[in-house]
């Protein structure tokens, strides 16, 4: 055997699919005898003020109470918010960083978001960049998973598609935010956050000057060059500034996930 990849030895990649429809399913549903007693690990906690690339983001410290519980208190927020986390999961005898199997988010006991990775559709792949803070990944190389359902996505693994992860925080009210994270072997971690509602803590960013509207075609024309964006090229509004520099066009920054490329 020869290993031609970046790992330390020969290995096998495989996937399992349902015969009807060729839908990929979670291989952990089968008796693979993989030892796993390790809980998901949480690195950072974030609140967002909206669902698109212009929403404000704020990071809050977490304190690890014990092996399974993280907490944070004294957080103030207002309006509609949703959650982001930097996290990973590992199995015994492996240092590979995996994603989690399922997540549930509740505010004062009411569930606002829930997903479970039993299967995944090939159609889900075009929405995958909506599950992360794409701008954060491109500018700071940090992968933050976002726990909300973007209006443009239609993930097959969402448990209740009527729960989009947005929670309304009202001034003068107190809230308990409880997040449950699980791997397939039922190793769980919990995040317990206490919030107080005030006015305008997470403000929506100001309107941009070079907005591309998703419902319109946009073309930037110069003397001998042009750039054309077909409508629905992006999942939401994008602030794209195009510069003509001699024989080169500089087309904005890669901080907006594209629907069509």
Which residue stretches match the model-derived regions?
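Proteolytic processing hotspots in large secreted/extracellular or virion-associated proteins
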Residues: 202-205, 241-261
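Flexible, gly/ser-rich surface segments that form the specificity/activation loops bordering the active-site cleft
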Residues: 1-11
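Compositionally biased low-complexity segments at domain edges in trafficked proteins
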Residues: 39-64, 204-237
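Extracellular recognition modules
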Residues: 15, 178-182
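Exoplasmic/lumenal beta-rich domain surfaces
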Residues: 64-71, 99, 105-168
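Acidic, glycine-rich catalytic/binding loops that coordinate metals and/or anionic ligands
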Residues: 15-89, 94-95, 124-133, 172-173
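Short beta-strand elements
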Residues: 174-176, 184-211
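Short, solvent-exposed loop/turn segments at the edges of extracellular beta-sandwich modules
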Residues: 3, 92, 182-187
């Amino acid at each position: 055997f020869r290993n031609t990849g970046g790992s330390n030895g020969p290995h096998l990649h495989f996937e399992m699919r349902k015969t009807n429809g060729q839908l990929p399913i979670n291989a952990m549903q089968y008796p693979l005898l993989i030892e796993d007693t390790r809980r998901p690990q949480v690195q950072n906690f974030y609140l967002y003020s909206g669902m698109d690339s212009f929403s404000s983001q704020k990071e809050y410290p977490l304190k690890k109470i014990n092996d399974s519980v993280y907490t944070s208190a004294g957080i103030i927020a207002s309006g509609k918010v949703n959650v982001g986390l930097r996290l990973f999961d590992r199995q015994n005898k492996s240092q590979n960083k995996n994603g989690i199997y399922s997540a549930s988010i509740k505010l004062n006991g009411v569930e606002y978001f829930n997903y479970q990775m039993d299967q995944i559709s090939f159609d889900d792949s075009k929405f995958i960049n909506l599950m992360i803070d794409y701008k954060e990944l491109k500018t700071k190389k940090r992968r933050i998973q976002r726990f909300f359902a973007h209006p443009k996505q239609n993930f097959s693994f969402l448990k209740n598609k009527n729960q989009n992860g947005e929670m309304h925080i009202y001034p003068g009210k107190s809230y308990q935010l409880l997040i449950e994270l699980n791997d397939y072997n039922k190793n769980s971690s919990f995040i317990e956050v206490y919030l107080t509602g005030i006015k305008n803590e997470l403000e929506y960013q100001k309107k941009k000057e070079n907005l591309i509207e998703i419902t319109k075609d946009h073309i930037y024309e110069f003397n001998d060059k042009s750039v054309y964006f077909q409508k629905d090229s992006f999942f939401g509004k994008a602030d794209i500034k195009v510069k003509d520099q001699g024989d080169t066009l500089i087309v904005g920054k890669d901080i907006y996930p594209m629907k069509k490329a």
